[in-house]
Structures are given as structure tokens and as C-alpha cells.
Amino acid sequence: MSKPSLTLPRIVLHDLWQHKWILLLALLVLSNAVAVVYTSHVSRKLTTEWDQLLQERDRLDIEWRNLLLEEQSQTEHSRITRIASKDLNMSRPLPSEEIVVKVP
């Protein structure tokens, strides 16, 4: 027995070197698994953000419609004139009936 004894780390390294293609494939499979997990995470994050943006768009659309309705009702001058003349019996004064009041 003149053969030197090999230590366990040397044996493991020797086996790994002999089967380097299997080691390379194992590392590729592991990196692929990490990439799939990362891609899934990013996809879920973007989907959540997309849903929030859609909700914000819907909220802003409803607000815009309400503002348009409010603008239409506020700018309807004939409505104000009709209410003043019909319900309140008001009429536009003649220029001779106008009185200018000056505040000191």
C-alpha cells in the first residue's frame, strides 16, 4: 500500500471535475428556476399595478363625467332666467328704473 490516501474533499473535487457537464447542467437548472421565480414576481407586481391604474382611470372618468354635468347645469343661463321670472316673478329692470348705489 504505497498509494497515498485521498482525503474526502479531494475525492469530491475529483468526481465533480470528471462530471463537469452534469454540474454545469445542475447550475443551469438552478439559475433557470431562480429566473422563473423572479419573472413570476415581476409579472404579479405589474398585474397589481395595472389593476390599480385601471381603478384610478375609472374613478377619474366618473369624476370627469360629473364635472361635465355640473358645468352644463351651471352654464345654463336660460334656466336661471326661467326660474327668476317664473318662480320668483322677477324681471329685468328698464334702464330708467336702475338705481346706482355708491358706497363711500
UniProtKB/Swiss-Prot annotation:
<keyword id="KW-1003">Cell membrane</keyword>
<dbReference type="GO" id="GO:0005886">
    <property type="term" value="C:plasma membrane"/>
</dbReference>
<keyword id="KW-0812">Transmembrane</keyword>
<dbReference type="Pfam" id="PF04999">
    <property type="entry name" value="FtsL"/>
</dbReference>
<dbReference type="GO" id="GO:0032153">
    <property type="term" value="C:cell division site"/>
</dbReference>
<feature type="topological domain" description="Periplasmic">
    <location>
        <begin position="44"/>
        <end position="104"/>
    </location>
</feature>
<comment type="similarity">
    <text>Belongs to the FtsL family.</text>
</comment>
<keyword id="KW-0472">Membrane</keyword>
<dbReference type="InterPro" id="IPR011922">
    <property type="entry name" value="Cell_div_FtsL"/>
</dbReference>
<comment type="subunit">
    <text>Part of a complex composed of FtsB, FtsL and FtsQ.</text>
</comment>
<feature type="transmembrane region" description="Helical">
    <location>
        <begin position="21"/>
        <end position="43"/>
    </location>
</feature>
<keyword id="KW-1133">Transmembrane helix</keyword>
<comment type="function">
    <text>Essential cell division protein. May link together the upstream cell division proteins, which are predominantly cytoplasmic, with the downstream cell division proteins, which are predominantly periplasmic.</text>
</comment>
<feature type="topological domain" description="Cytoplasmic">
    <location>
        <begin position="1"/>
        <end position="20"/>
    </location>
</feature>
<protein>
    <recommendedName>
        <fullName>Cell division protein FtsL</fullName>
    </recommendedName>
</protein>
<keyword id="KW-0131">Cell cycle</keyword>
<keyword id="KW-0997">Cell inner membrane</keyword>
<dbReference type="GO" id="GO:0043093">
    <property type="term" value="P:FtsZ-dependent cytokinesis"/>
</dbReference>
<keyword id="KW-0132">Cell division</keyword>
